[in-house]
UniProtKB/Swiss-Prot annotation:
It is found in: Cytoplasm. GO terms for molecular function: DNA binding. InterPro entries: Integrase-like_N (IPR017856), TACO1_YebC-like_2nd/3rd_dom (IPR048300), TACO1_YebC_N (IPR049083), Transcrip_reg_TACO1-like (IPR002876), Transcrip_reg_TACO1-like_dom3 (IPR026564), YebC-like (IPR029072). This is Probable transcriptional regulatory protein RB5500. Keywords: Cytoplasm, DNA-binding, Transcription, Transcription regulation. Gene3D superfamilies: 1.10.10.200, 3.30.70.980. The lineage of its organism: Bacteria, Pseudomonadati, Planctomycetota, Planctomycetia, Pirellulales. Belongs to the TACO1 family. It comes from Rhodopirellula baltica (strain DSM 10527 / NCIMB 13988 / SH1). GO terms for cellular component: cytosol.
Amino acid sequence: MAGHSKWANIQHRKGRVDAQRGKMWSKLSKAIIVSAKMGGGDPSLNIRLRKAIDDAKAVSMPKDNIERAIKRGTGELDGDAVEEVLYEGYGPGGVAVMCLALTDNRNRTAPELRTMFGKFGGELGKTGCVSYLFERKGIFVFGEGADEEKVTELALENGADDVEVDEDGKVQVTCSPEAFSDLEVAFDEAGMDTEVSEVTQIASTNVDLDESVSGKVLALLEALDDHDDIQTVSTNANFPSESVSE
């Protein structure tokens, strides 16, 4: 899981800067729309929607924007349909990359991602080209200084598969997608804040990168992460510590 943990840490630091610029509003609006469409417009009954709303509030997204997104998801307001699409490809050095997009226009998103992959030395592939290298997992990352014993106890009581502490002292919990909601509720009720909380694609095995390639891979991943339609980016790349600390 080390490769995912390092990339997740980079995303978390970068996300704080993005939030200050308001760049997350478009992404979060789509997340709210899809969450409301899948589970209804009541956040007290729809944990995924509640998390999307909390994320939106954390970056000062206006209340009216949030309410409009919910109503688009429930069908109370008209708008282009937003759907989840999983894109797969290869980065520099042949590393595997998977991107979860929320898009209202596949004919726009796919060409843009194809161009982006090519610009950074990669290639957008066909469905199934790298997905066999990943498993769909829930993941929670707690910052340095988190109570490892308390995290572990709650995690194991609520269906987690594994608890690890990475080299930066961060506690990482992984679980099946089915156990994600129970764990999310347990951590929330215990007042335990997470740096990362999502269901994503986790590589079964990681590919170690040297410095000559890691910078190119990071440039691609960060560009993909910046795209308005992309919600999560996963890779099987394992970055040198020097790359993560930059």
